[in-house]
Swiss-Prot record:
Cofactor binding mode and count: Binds a second Mg(2+) ion via substrate during catalysis.
Binding residues for (2R)-2-phosphoglycerate: 165, 338, 367-368, 389
Gene name per UniProt: eno
Active site annotation, chain numbering: 209, 338
Pathway(s) served: Carbohydrate degradation; glycolysis; pyruvate from D-glyceraldehyde 3-phosphate: step 4/5
Enzyme class: lyase
NCBIfam families: eno (TIGR01060)
The UniProt record lists the keyword Disulfide bond: no
Protein name per the record: Enolase
């Protein structure tokens, strides 16, 4: 009997994310010498129904320390998992879910559980001498995702007046992932010059995800800026736009309306605004266009914005129960997958499979609080997701994912870049 995959040691510690906030890092060792480690990300605009990120609420780090989550790994989870076969991912995840005993992972913390879940998968892959994408996806993992690069930041990710959170470029006309990265990087530098010319050199400061955060006041102004950057780079035919409205962040529950540019706007009016934008600019995808609880509104938006990818992030929070409801209603047509929203690798894969089985596209995503950890790059390829959203081609915690994908494409030799087939990449 091969015991080389047996978990030999699990250890967690508190480290920092890209915003200087504490997060959980976990390391897993197997008896066969396999090693895996993961640093858990953290979001700024979070869905109400996300799994619980356990914070200490003490004076340290302004209440954001995660020492309790770290202790939960070292003192509780580790004791239960030592000796388990690291290849039994679903069993290991279920053991942790049983230990926690809550629907939202509020006892042990999703940050504790996820750190171990991903580190176990990495340790198993290392023991098997396989790259993570191949360990999870097998020989069928061959699709390189089209990157959605967030080059203009607003909302919770920046300090400007923009209501929408992310203005992204997606190089669907590239022939490979490496070429896609080049196109985006060149456009990013082109946009930097446009921003400097229009707003001054002091305006080329960047937001949490590496995109520029100039003093833009309107959504139309931001889109026009983006278009000029793409034109100057020479990629009008290759690059399209995607948006993350993060509409829950500017929704006023008391009045049931959205505050856009300082004015109250109804759901119908906001959908009309999206229609106007889609008609004027090369927008192919809109994430969280409406309030996270408005399944009916999402259904209408999906019907009205024909041909546009409507992505559910805060709407679904990578949760199969919420995704099932959306599928049954026809709310949205795409799932944004964030592993820390749900808290285990198994549940993340379940959500991806449910999306694909029901004709929903898939976007694997980072969080605004990231690290040098590049796990989601491997996951995007393992799932043949077709799309990945992990920030601008700037800041080390963002480029770490892009660089890993460049390596994976090189290693695969025969792969398919999703490109224009980003919705149905296989």
């Amino acid at each position: 009997m091969d015991d080389s995959f047996d978990i030999y040691e699990i250890k967690a510690r508190q480290v920092l994310d890209s915003r200087g906030n504490p997060t959980v890092e976990a390391e897993v060792l197997t008896a066969g010498g396999g090693y895996g480690h993961t640093i858990v990300p953290s979001g700024a605009s979070t869905g109400t129904f996300e799994a619980v990120e356990l914070r200490d609420a003490t004076e340290k780090y302004g209440g954001k320390s995660v020492l309790n989550a770290v202790s939960n790994v070292n003192d509780i989870i580790a004791q239960e998992l030592i000796g388990e076969d690291a290849r039994n991912q679903r069993l290991i995840d279920q053991i942790m879910l049983n230990l926690d005993g809550t629907e939202n992972k509020g006892n042990l913390g999703a940050n504790a559980i996820l750190a171990v879940s991903l580190a176990v998968a990495k340790a198993a892959a290392d023991t098997a001498s396989l790259p993570l994408y191949k360990y999870i996806g097998g020989c069928n993992a061959y699709v390189m995702p089209a990157p959605m690069m967030n080059v203009l930041n607003g909302g919770q990710h920046a300090g400007n007046a923009l209501d929408f959170q992310e203005f992204m470029i997606m190089p669907v006309g590239a022939d490979s992932f490496a070429e896609a990265v080049r196109m985006c990087a060149e456009t990013y530098q082109s946009l930097k010059k446009v921003v400097a010319e229009k707003y001054g050199k002091d305006a080329v400061n960047i937001g949490d995800e590496g995109g520029f955060a100039p003093p833009v006041k309107t959504i139309d102004e931001a889109l026009a800026l983006l278009l000029e950057g793409v034109k100057r780079a020479g990629y009008e035919d290759e690059i399209v736009f995607t948006l993350d409205s993060a509409a829950s962040e500017f929704y006023d529950e008391k009045s049931g309306s959205y505050i856009v540019a300082g004015e109250k706007v109804s759901t119908d009016k906001l959908i009309d605004i999206y229609k106007e934008m889609v008609a004027q600019y090369p927008i192919v995808s809109i994430e969280d266009p409406l309030f996270e609880e408005d399944f009916e509104g999402f259904k209408i938006a999906t019907q009205e914005l024909k041909g546009i990818q409507i992505v559910g992030d805060d709407l679904f929070v990578t949760n199969t129960k919420r995704l099932k409801k959306g599928i049954e209603m026809g709310a949205a047509n795409s799932l944004l997958l964030k592993v820390n929203q749900i808290g285990t690798l198994s549940e993340s894969i379940d959500a991806a499979n449910m999306a694909f089985r029901n004709g929903y596209s898939l976007v694997v995503s980072h969080r605004s609080g990231e690290s040098e950890d590049s796990t989601i790059a491997d996951l995007a390829v393992a799932l043949n997701a077709g799309q990945i959203k992990t920030g601008a081609p700037a800041r080390g915690e963002r480029t770490a994912k892009y660089n890993q994908l460049i390596r994976i494409e090189e290693e695969l030799q025969i792969s398919k870049y999703a490109g224009k087939d980003f919705k149905v990449p296989f």
